[in-house]
């Protein structure tokens, strides 16, 4: 299954990032992300921002309730359990669930920009970038060691391909 984000940077269109979701390995996690891309439950990623970007690590987004990393919710309720840790953080461009500890998945996700093996067994990998890693790198360059983002990076539109 493929989904997309149409991104703007400081209000200007920046391009589309496409993802493949690994629904064969983590169907529940993939279904949550897909539904948040389509907005079919009445809420989702459209209009939300990347609130935390750390160069040589990752881009984090998906907090569409508070926008600062403290909010978000899943289609299954506020939080849902870690589905499994079969997939590893072995390369750049992987989609993984952000969390606040075991079994606290909501809507926040991150895109890796380097291999992150220290996250294996703690965060659920559920997809990967299939198109436009160049835009991922551009967004990465707007981050900082603290995670503060130097520009407003927004998911203007998103859905299923």
Swiss-Prot record:
GO terms for molecular function: cyclosporin A binding; peptidyl-prolyl cis-trans isomerase activity. The keyword Amino-acid biosynthesis does not apply. Binds cyclosporin A (CsA). CsA mediates some of its effects via an inhibitory action on PPIase. The keyword 4Fe-4S does not apply. One of its GO terms (biological process) is protein folding. Belongs to the cyclophilin-type PPIase family. PPIase A subfamily. This is Peptidyl-prolyl cis-trans isomerase A2. It comes from Rhizopus delemar (strain RA 99-880 / ATCC MYA-4621 / FGSC 9543 / NRRL 43880) (Mucormycosis agent).
